[in-house]
Amino acid sequence: LGGMALILLITYFIWNLHTLWELFENKTKVENELERSSTLIHCVTELSANQDVDEAINHLLEIINQYFKSDRTYIFEIDEERQIVHNSYEYAAKGVSKEIENLNEVPIQIIASWIKKFEREGSFYISNLDLEKDREDERAYECLKAQNVNSLIAVPLIRNREIIGFIGVDNPRKNYRDFPFLSSVQFFIMNRLDTKA
């Protein structure tokens, strides 16, 4: 009976550990979802409450930057007629250099591979830029390296099924797989940009 009691005790102990682990995982998932929902509401509130479109979008980029614990968050818009992309909005974390002035008229060919990725995949994440060196256009790689970008998330801005730009997040340290969050935000950004036009 002693051996059987020990086996039952060990089984009970293992079952309790398993149950506690599941509760911990569920709690973490709920906390992450709550943070995500709260941040999304904050983004929508910022865009709808602020009458100044530029100011609203800049504040929105700050909120996104904090959510991803990233270095820089920005919006690029495509000018098809001039075959360039320009950095129209940017937020940089404290101690991180702003690049908006350096990226005003970038030839569209530099991001041609990104546009193809947007068309194929919708959004993408580069976890390690050095591992992508052979797959990226050399000029795009050098441009990102010069800005100390090691990883990034990019989600297209879409109007009438046409890619008109993208939102980028440089060096995200948290939530870096949360494409649905950025995709949701891009919808609200497009609505707000349309009111500016």
What is the predicted role of each segment?
Residues L157-N160, K174-N175:
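Sensor-regulatory modules in signal-transduction proteins
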Residues Y125-S151:
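Signal-transducing coupling segments at domain and membrane junctions
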Residues N150-I158:
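A short, aliphatic-rich beta-strand micro-motif
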Residues L17-A49, V53, T195:
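Signal-transmission linkers at sensory-effector interfaces
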Residues Y74-S123:
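GAF sensory/regulatory domain recognition
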Residues D134-R135, D170-V185, I189-R192, K196:
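Regulatory loop-to-helix N-cap segments in sensory/regulatory domains
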Residues L1-H18:
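Membrane-embedded alpha-helical segments, specifically the hydrophobic cores
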Residues E46-S88, K98, K196:
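Helix-loop-beta substructure at the N-terminus of cytosolic sensory domains
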